[in-house]
């Protein structure tokens, strides 16, 4: 499902216009991005998803073309965890 299909499904389910559903989805993504980028708190939707920023340590990897070792600097990544209700839905229960 792509963004436009998701917006259409949200609009139908919530009985709002596609424009309004798209605005809500865009605002949700922006708010989650802002909170996660600060890194001081998680965004949790109980039973559904949790978004949090994680620290990745510096590490040595290999260039896949040459096999030469390269240094990858420390940085941050985003961890998304499925909640219990989403896991149950994926199992078909």
Curated annotation (Swiss-Prot):
InterPro entries: Hist_DNA-bd, Histone-like_DNA-bd_CS, IHF-like_DNA-bd_dom_sf. GO terms for molecular function: DNA binding; structural constituent of chromatin. The keyword DNA-binding applies. It is found in: Cytoplasm, Nucleoid. Keywords: Cytoplasm, DNA condensation, DNA-binding. Its main location: cytoplasm. CDD domains: SPO1_TF1_like. GO terms for cellular component: cytosol; nucleoid. One of its GO terms (biological process) is chromosome condensation. SUPFAM superfamilies: IHF-like DNA-binding proteins. Histone-like DNA-binding protein which is capable of wrapping DNA to stabilize it, and thus to prevent its denaturation under extreme environmental conditions. PANTHER family: DNA-BINDING PROTEIN HU, DNA-BINDING PROTEIN HU-BETA. Homodimer. Belongs to the bacterial histone-like protein family. This is DNA-binding protein HU 1. It comes from Streptomyces coelicolor (strain ATCC BAA-471 / A3(2) / M145). The gene is hup1.
């Amino acid at each position: 499902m792509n963004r436009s299909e998701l917006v259409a499904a949200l609009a139908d389910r919530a009985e709002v216009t596609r424009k309004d559903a798209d605005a809500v989805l865009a605002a949700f993504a922006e708010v989650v991005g802002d909170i996660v980028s600060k890194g001081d708190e998680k965004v949790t939707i109980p039973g559904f998803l949790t978004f949090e920023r994680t620290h990745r340590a510096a590490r040595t990897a290999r260039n896949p073309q040459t096999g030469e070792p390269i240094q990858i600097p420390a940085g941050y990544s985003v961890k998304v965890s499925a909640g219990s209700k989403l896991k149950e839905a994926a199992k078909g229960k």
